[in-house]
Amino acid sequence: DYTSFAIGIDLGVNYFHEENDFSASLTLKNLGGQVKTFDEEHEKLPLNMQVGFTKRLAHAPIRISVTLDDLTHWESSYYNPEGKDISFGDLLFNHVVMGVEVAPSDRFYLAAGYNCKRANDLKADGGSKWTGATLGGGLQLKRIKLGVAYANYHTAASSLVLNFSMGL
């Protein structure tokens, strides 16, 4: 009988400056560890620290977001499996997720994002030109909300998600 047991928690803190429409957040994912080991060897949970910033432009209905992901594994072999020399810029962009949202009204928005690490990983495996990109939008009519999102998380397929919600 092979079993293992671990306890983990995600923690986050957010600062929001309403006057400047600026937000800064810090999250720590997978804090914790094994309680019962699989084979007497303790394994660490994959700790992930993220820092994100979002700012709405002062004179346009545009919000820009930048998140730095997996900061606890800055130069991990996961980001450089062949052990080659990587420039600071390339290393930095392996941790960057960018997004932009255009919301001309409270009832309509369009959004786009780009995950540099996902793009690099999947393009190396033959991914499409959309690899790493996400697109979405939403519309709110009186009591009905409609949303659509596109993402490419695999070399063989993309996902298209439609959502519909209605207030009671």
Residue ranges and their predicted role:
Residues 1-168:
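Outer-membrane beta-barrel porins/channels
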